[in-house]
């Protein structure tokens, strides 16, 4: 029998310890992985609610199971808030992840073997934008565009490539691009070749919601995003569109029943909370600070002699090219991690290293900004990171790591994730 008093600590102490250790890790480490963030206690409360128990196949008002009247309220709340947040006529809040949202868009608009044109993973795209190891590169004929040696999208080259390969869909969006994307230009190119423009805005959705990064909504046929990352919600996906009922029906059918069964109603409840939080005025302040912090960090890295891909950032992330310092991304990632600074290794343009080694690191500011870091704090942090990188392969490396870790623990104590 079930009792409210049941808990993990008594029943499964090994699992409980892992949870406690992760809580401590998050509090005592500075999180600079661009795709990570901290969900609010309200989001986590919703995700742990009793909607965990409810099957709700179908959509609000059209369910295959009974007892869905409250699930309908929750899902409709999430839909309405998502539409208001991004200026969309249509929203599907059921995708379990960003990748599943993307898969649904492909299924709705393409046939197997159709040509897609997306940004290369090695140049800052995403697995689902046509990488050979992804469904997007296996089911569809994937062509890839890249960035210049300066780290920028060459729209003239993209136009030429689109006219040559004649894609059914052009995919916009990225996982490691630090500049503004010209969505209008991409739509112009798509229209020239009769292609759909599909934008995956997962990395910058929070910035877009706050108005600090241009929205693709006026230009794209369909837009997807994750609900974590800069949106700081639960892990999940979202599809948005401004079009017509025929398009919306195709998208709905591609999510359910084609791609998924029952939605995760407890996660949809958490998405509803996330969207409400993102509609608050303080969310705009937070997102503006995310960009300010990224720019402040870039300034320090450049002053210390490190190359930043595209020479700067206009969003929440940037790539540090370590080639001229003779370092690999893998080694830099490991060294910073020992000082409780978490980044991820990342390929840079024309990277001479293998994908699991790389010549760069990706740095993002959503999580550190969420816990209260300002420009002064992140500038100091960037200096500590440069100290560690400068000391690699030198006699004082271990001491620099030890000294930096002390500073990291002190600032984490001053600015806790969950005070």
From Swiss-Prot:
Binding site for (6S)-5,6,7,8-tetrahydrofolate: 121, 125-127
PROSITE patterns for this protein: SHMT (PS00096)
Record's subcellular location: Cytoplasm
Gene3D superfamilies from the UniProt entry: Aspartate Aminotransferase, domain 1, Type I PLP-dependent aspartate aminotransferase-like (Major domain)
Catalytic reaction list: (6R)-5,10-methylene-5,6,7,8-tetrahydrofolate + glycine + H2O = (6S)-5,6,7,8-tetrahydrofolate + L-serine
UniProt key word Amino-acid biosynthesis: yes
Organism domain of life: Bacteria
Pathway: One-carbon metabolism; tetrahydrofolate interconversion; Amino-acid biosynthesis; glycine biosynthesis; glycine from L-serine: step 1/1
Gene Ontology molecular function: glycine hydroxymethyltransferase activity; pyridoxal phosphate binding
Chief location of this protein within or outside the cell: cytoplasm
Site (Plays an important role in substrate specificity): 228
Keywords annotated in UniProt: Amino-acid biosynthesis, Cytoplasm, One-carbon metabolism, Pyridoxal phosphate, Transferase
Cofactors, names only: pyridoxal 5'-phosphate
One GO-annotated biological process of the protein: glycine biosynthetic process from serine
Keyword 4Fe-4S tagged: no
Location of N6-(pyridoxal phosphate)lysine modifications: 229
Gene Ontology CC annotations of this record: cytosol
EC number(s) per entry: 2.1.2.1
Described function: Catalyzes the reversible interconversion of serine and glycine with tetrahydrofolate (THF) serving as the one-carbon carrier. This reaction serves as the major source of one-carbon groups required for the biosynthesis of purines, thymidylate, methionine, and other important biomolecules. Also exhibits THF-independent aldolase activity toward beta-hydroxyamino acids, producing glycine and aldehydes, via a retro-aldol mechanism.
Subunit-structure text: Homodimer.
Homology family: Belongs to the SHMT family.
Protein name, UniProt field: Serine hydroxymethyltransferase
Native source organism of the sequence: Histophilus somni (strain 2336) (Haemophilus somnus)
